[in-house]
């Protein structure tokens, strides 16, 4: 199974790139974690946010290979504990499909992305900066993988 993190925003600070890559490289080849960056729409004083969200959403959906299981990261989503995320990851593997996880921009996800989702995950009730979300998601997925494989990374 492949995991695909599709996130709005490019040109992240080095600490974000290094943090994400640290967890990305830990995954085994049979569960690769890929990052796809979607350019953020230009925001300004008179920006048409609805149009920007729509365009970002179209680009995100276009980046998802046909047949992937889609999970949005969104406040109304499910709050998973590590064991619950590990269980969800097991189900994804048994389903036999790759997984695309969608992280929106400053205004969140386009309605079309939310409608296309099979699941929604609330990473935190806190508002987190989007660059940090990439690292937290990568670490959380790696930790869930470690639970499923009895790897010593996760300790109860």
Curated annotation (Swiss-Prot):
Chemical reaction(s) catalysed = pseudouridine(1915) in 23S rRNA + S-adenosyl-L-methionine = N(3)-methylpseudouridine(1915) in 23S rRNA + S-adenosyl-L-homocysteine + H(+)
The EC designation for this entry is 2.1.1.177
CDD domains recorded: RlmH-like
Q: Which domain of life is it from?
A: Bacteria
**Where is this protein localized, as stated in its record?**
Cytoplasm
Q: Return the GO cellular component terms, semicolon-separated.
A: cytoplasm
Q: Which Pfam families match?
A: SPOUT_MTase (PF02590)
Record keywords: Cytoplasm, Methyltransferase, rRNA processing, S-adenosyl-L-methionine, Transferase
Q: Does the keyword rRNA processing apply?
A: yes
| Enzyme class (EC, first level) | transferase
| SUPFAM superfamilies noted in UniProt | alpha/beta knot
What is the purpose of this protein? Specifically methylates the pseudouridine at position 1915 (m3Psi1915) in 23S rRNA.
Protein family: Belongs to the RNA methyltransferase RlmH family.
The protein in question is named Ribosomal RNA large subunit methyltransferase H
* Species this protein is from: Shewanella sp. (strain ANA-3)
């Amino acid at each position: 199974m492949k995991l695909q993190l599709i996130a709005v925003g490019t040109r992240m600070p080095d600490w974000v790139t290094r943090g994400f890559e640290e967890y990305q490289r830990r995954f085994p080849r049979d569960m690769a974690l890929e990052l796809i960056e979607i350019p953020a729409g230009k925001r300004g004083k008179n920006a048409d946010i609805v149009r920007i969200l729509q365009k970002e959403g179209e680009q995100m959906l276009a980046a998802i290979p046909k047949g992937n299981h889609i999970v949005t990261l969104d406040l109304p989503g499910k709050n998973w504990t590590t064991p619950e995320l590990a269980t969800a990851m097991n189900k994804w593997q048994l389903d036999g499909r790759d997984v695309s996880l969608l992280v929106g921009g400053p205004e969140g996800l386009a309605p079309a992305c939310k409608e296309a989702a099979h699941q929604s995950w609330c990473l935190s009730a806190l508002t987190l900066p989007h660059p940090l979300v990439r690292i937290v998601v990568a670490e959380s997925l790696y930790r869930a993988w470690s639970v499923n494989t009895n790897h010593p990374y996760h300790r109860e």
